[in-house]
Amino acid sequence: TEFTKIVKGMKRDVHYDIDEAKKQVHPTELGIEYVESKLGISNLYENSQTNFIHYLTACLRAKTIFAKDVDYIVSNGQINIVDEFTGRVLEGRRYSDGLHQALEAKENVRIQDENQTLASITYQNYFRMYENLAGMTGTAKTEEEEFIQIYNLEVVEIPTNLPIQRMDQQDAVYKTNEAKLNAVIEDIIERNKKGQPILLGTVSVEASEEVSKQLTSKGIVHNVLNAKNHEQEAQIIAQAGRLGAVTVATNMAGRGVDIKLGGNPEEIAFQYQVKENKLDDPMYLDSKIHELELQVSEEKNKVLELGGLYVLGTERHDSRRIDNQLRGRSGRQGDPGESRFYISLQDDLMRRFQGERIESIMNKLNLPDEERIEQSMVTKSIERAQAQVESLNFEIRKNVLKFDQVLNQQREVIYKWRRQLLRSDSIENLISEWFDDV
């Protein structure tokens, strides 16, 4: 907690520098002097102070790199990590190297003991332990190079069961986040008037709550699905394809979720069963499903006439794969559908990877904030930013694997001994053999 208080007084570009692309933070010389003066010591790097550097780094990362309702949520007095790709809480997982304790101090919740890691392995070396390796996903093509290089696996693209009728519209680009959000709300209002179901995808809990506030202020009835209310996922998704439904969701709704147009009769019937306290009546559910099937079928036909589910993304993700997963919620099994991404030049992705280039473009365009930007240069910058992130993340994974290869040789020896011990009828004989070897 002492370091959390010290770090609060430190200023960016004075006491520390941030590399936003790599999500790293480093104290400057002035920053080191500031910490030394606050602690009343002469040298932060003395052997007796080695833990201080560890605490400082963790607290700086907690302050500058990790954001509440983006990277984690605070629930029941605990810090819960949110998976950036799935939008779900990683139950039982904690950050290492003192970072979790730094976040607990930052959010003023009970600081728990640091976990002790007894064994670890990279995903790559873990998967390589299987003799036969295969997998299925709807978004493997964008990662084809990595599958070949790391796992020596080819990617085979299987045609869809029915032709895709979804229309993927060109990105709508705006100068500021405020202008983008206003355009998003206007689009939702227009679609909602017709009754077309809308799925609005956001990149974080914080963003989903901000959009929800705006929709509430405009009187738009909607549901919100994020890591804070994940227990309601089945009920919310069951209603997401119905006439007039507006669903605001994080990546939770962008992966492996089947949104049925007109609604899901089984799940809706179960909700009625719970509401009417009929859980002990085995006949109720079947009769309710049968009753709802006709209603859902009629509603589905109306939704199809309106163009199916409209998927609206409020920001491009670091990975094209995640964007494709969100688009894929619409136009399933040959149904019509539509998707569009709304982008601001202030979005995290653009700021981190194309900041200077975008600033140069904007100075040339001199457009008002609320005007939509239709420039090929901007579109190319967005594509370039995503390609940069994917390339950087791939390089990070390759480097992690290189370091783990050294440990992997030792790991294989240890696990070989472990297997021998577990399978041996006589441990004494094994110990004697090892004793002789030594």
Task: Label every model-predicted segment.
Residues 29, 178, 182, 376-379, ...:
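Alpha-helix N-cap/helix-start motif at coil-to-helix transitions, marked by capping-box chemistry
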Residues 175-178, 372, 401:
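Charge-dense, low-complexity intrinsically disordered segments
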Residues 357, 362-392:
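C-terminal helicase lobe
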Residues 384-438:
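C-terminal accessory/connector segments of nucleic-acid motor ATPases
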Residues 1-366, 415-416, 433, 437:
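Conserved P-loop NTPase motor core
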